[in-house]
């Protein structure tokens, strides 16, 4: 047994179709490990199986076959009981695409307190958790506000605070920025990074945005329910032709860097973001200037 926080072995899942004789495969024989504190992006186009995988990891869906281990315990075992599932969901929280579907109260602090209250915690402990969670997501000043009056990004941060208040060790973001405008996306992405770097939470970001995936420690690429690439952003985006074949692009900065490298211009360092790419190009130009 490995020391991975999440371990998936030969995981498969099929949805039932209209015909009882047929099923629709969504995840096919997928295996990987995630260590505690990692920042993982799961990348794929629509229908690739990434959201289904997210629901399997939180046991919202039960796999057709294969095994899932969380913190060393097999949650797909026949011996699993309801208390084990509740414990799993305290360890692994989820933030969904539409924050309106996750917000349950009419006042921000009451919404964030909903989960801890259902754990039967003492009011003082609930108060502490609510205050800490809102501080982490930068929404303390909105504690008495009505969630429906907030922007999309602010609502999503309230939804995240509600998950944080449960004290999970991992949060799965299931396309949590897909419905947000650019400002809201930046707010939520910044929150993901803060949770990972400052709070040491394991973050799994299910996304189809290349720039979001580029921020992860590791990227898992799904296509047609199968895992086709698993590596660092640099390793994954170096497979530009393979990504193009399955309908995915690479970040613009990476595409530019790849063209320059193909033209014989040597770039040093990372080129995953516009700033890092610009710095690499600048250094390459300086180097070429000193050689001429």
Each language-model region and where it sits:
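Conserved ABC transporter NBD signature motif
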Residues: 66-77, 88
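Conserved ABC ATPase signature
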Residues: 146-150, 154
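Catalytic Walker B motif of ABC-type/P-loop ATPase nucleotide-binding domains
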Residues: 171-174
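Helix-to-loop junction immediately C-terminal to a conserved catalytic motif
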Residues: 58
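The feature captures the beta-strand-to-loop junction immediately N-terminal to the Walker
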Residues: 43-45
């Amino acid at each position: 047994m490995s020391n991975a926080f999440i371990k998936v072995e030969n995981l498969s899942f099929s949805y039932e179709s209209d015909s009882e004789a047929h099923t629709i495969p969504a995840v096919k024989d997928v295996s990987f490990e995630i260590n505690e504190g990692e920042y993982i992006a799961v990348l794929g186009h629509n229908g690739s199986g990434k959201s289904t995988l997210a629901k399997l990891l939180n046991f919202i869906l039960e796999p057709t076959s294969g095994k899932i281990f969380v913190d060393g315990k097999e949650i797909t075992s026949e011996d699993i009981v309801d208390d084990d599932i509740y414990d799993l969901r305290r360890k692994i929280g989820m933030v969904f695409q539409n924050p309106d579907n996750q917000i349950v109260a009419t006042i921000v602090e009451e919404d964030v307190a909903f989960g801890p209250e259902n754990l039967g915690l003492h009011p003082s402990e609930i108060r502490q958790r609510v205050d800490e969670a809102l501080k982490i997501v930068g929404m303390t000043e909105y504690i008495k506000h009505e969630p429906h009056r907030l922007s999309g990004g602010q609502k999503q941060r309230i939804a995240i605070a509600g998950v944080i208040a449960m004290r999970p060790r991992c949060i799965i973001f299931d396309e949590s920025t897909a419905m947000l405008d650019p400002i809201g996306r930046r707010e939520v992405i910044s929150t993901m990074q803060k949770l990972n770097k400052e709070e040491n939470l394991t973050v799994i970001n299910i996304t189809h945005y290349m720039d979001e995936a580029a921020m992860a420690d590791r990227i898992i690429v799904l296509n047609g329910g199968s895992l086709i690439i698993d590596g660092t952003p640099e390793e994954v985006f170096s497979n530009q032709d393979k990504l193009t074949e399955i309908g995915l692009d690479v970040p613009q900065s990476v595409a530019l860097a790849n063209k320059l490298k193909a033209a014989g211009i040597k770039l040093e360092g990372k080129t995953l973001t516009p700033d890092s790419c610009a710095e690499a190009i600048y250094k390459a130009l300086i180097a070429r200037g000193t050689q001429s």
